[in-house]
């Protein structure tokens, strides 16, 4: 394959990748696909990678319309790129109108991106089968309950667009669990165990029954009543479900259904002393709520095995269990307990701190719920483990917010450029949006005694040397004459953009000092970039997204004449 032919091939792949992911191609994804589909190029991988990087840089400078137009000139995307995804696979045994699913979070904090997967998958299947989605708050561990989480979960689901048909809170259902426990004891499917916990573990690990297992139901019911009336202290008695004592999974053997917790529950106070474990309450509720399908991660397979014993002992029909692969979310804090500790210690500012992966943090950054939903549905319901792609999420979000995001200039760690030799003011008219007729914004370079001033981005200033020609976007060309510590001095060179191109000039954004407003941008690592934004940004409302040209998209958090505070979304 000749060099030009290779470059044309790479360009097509880059255009297709950009069209698919919000107007920006990913060089790694382009390279991977080329190597997969053109094995003959593998010996030239180094050369191909160099070409990929060059071409991707070119494509990523194009507008969405330019990308679409060039793809159409090439005959449109290839079939494998253009065809629709197969979507979610059918649920086993599902009948339209007779599907009941549940989303069952623990109220230890608000929802994060991992919760979103379960919520979206259940919601999507409920919609597809005209079914019912139950929200069940699983709060039977008094030590893992945050009272504020109940409302936060509801708010997060509403923002995510998840439709809830029925709502239940397990701490309101304790008496029901007691009734089922008594029935289980009557049927001799469970027993009260008063063994020392360490001794029980020793017996369990070697596959032997403890002495308590042989108690008759009358004695078990008496001991159960003593558990309820406070005769026993925490750790002295539990209710165990009968299983095979030598079950291959030691975690399943004689698992605990009820235990004593001597701590007040944030919602019920000290009313209850005996609490069901998650596995017992879940099994009971899945039956009583007529759940037909349980969608859960593979890491819950052991829980499924445990819960089935309750169904078997009580003669209940089991739901269909569908276990999907584990979703790895790299570079993000998901643990609500870890986040809570960080909030309490002052490390994090709150549940929406940009360093954590809660839905609140993503919302604060300007991530659309639709982008989250699409990214989750792309992963689908597969038993293969997957890694959550932040790049795919950002690409989808970019595609959604780009049309509604006005453009402005923001210079970080600004360096002042003094432009000598300017005889008259230059009025720069810039579009609010490059592809849509949204009006314009105006910046003015106004000389005083022949000297105009402009603030440049610190990174751009670092690349300028004496003798360089730099173009201030939509304004003038300036020749750099002197580079100082934190300042530049230049001389007016020309107006025409074509001259700048001939000179190989660096093209930079800029802000006039007298038309600037202080601006801070909170980055994903919690750091803050400070500088000045053009004053035109003050016309925007807090909560809107904008693009700081040549930098990134942000969500405006505070907008006033005193300054702007924004939160980084993505490039």
UniProtKB/Swiss-Prot annotation:
Superkingdom in the source lineage: Archaea
InterPro entries found in the cross-reference section: aa-tRNA-synth_I_CS, Gln/Glu-tRNA_Ligase, Glu-tRNA-synth_arc/euk, Glu/Gln-tRNA-synth, Glu/Gln-tRNA-synth_Ib_cat-dom, Glu/Gln-tRNA-synth_Ib_codon-bd, Rbsml_bL25/Gln-tRNA_synth_N, Ribosomal_bL25/Gln-tRNA_synth
Enzyme class (EC, first level): ligase
Gene3D superfamilies in the cross-refs: 2.40.240.100, HUPs, Ribosomal Protein L25, Chain P
Comp. bias regions, Basic and acidic residues: 75-88
Protein family membership: Belongs to the class-I aminoacyl-tRNA synthetase family. Glutamate--tRNA ligase type 2 subfamily.
Stretches for region Disordered: 75-98
Chain's role: Catalyzes the attachment of glutamate to tRNA(Glu) in a two-step reaction: glutamate is first activated by ATP to form Glu-AMP and then transferred to the acceptor end of tRNA(Glu).
Species this protein is from: Methanopyrus kandleri (strain AV19 / DSM 6324 / JCM 9639 / NBRC 100938)
Residue interval(s) of motif 'HIGH' region: 105-115
SUPFAM superfamilies (UniProt xref): Nucleotidylyl transferase, Ribosomal protein L25-like
GO MF: ATP binding; glutamate-tRNA ligase activity
Keywords: Aminoacyl-tRNA synthetase, ATP-binding, Cytoplasm, Ligase, Nucleotide-binding, Protein biosynthesis
Gene Ontology cellular component list: cytosol; protein-containing complex
EC number in record: 6.1.1.17
Pfam family, one: tRNA-synt_1c_C
Biological processes annotated in GO: amide biosynthetic process; glutamyl-tRNA aminoacylation
Protein name stated in the entry: Glutamate--tRNA ligase
Catalysed reaction, written as an equation: tRNA(Glu) + L-glutamate + ATP = L-glutamyl-tRNA(Glu) + AMP + diphosphate
Subcellular localization, as worded in the UniProt entry: Cytoplasm
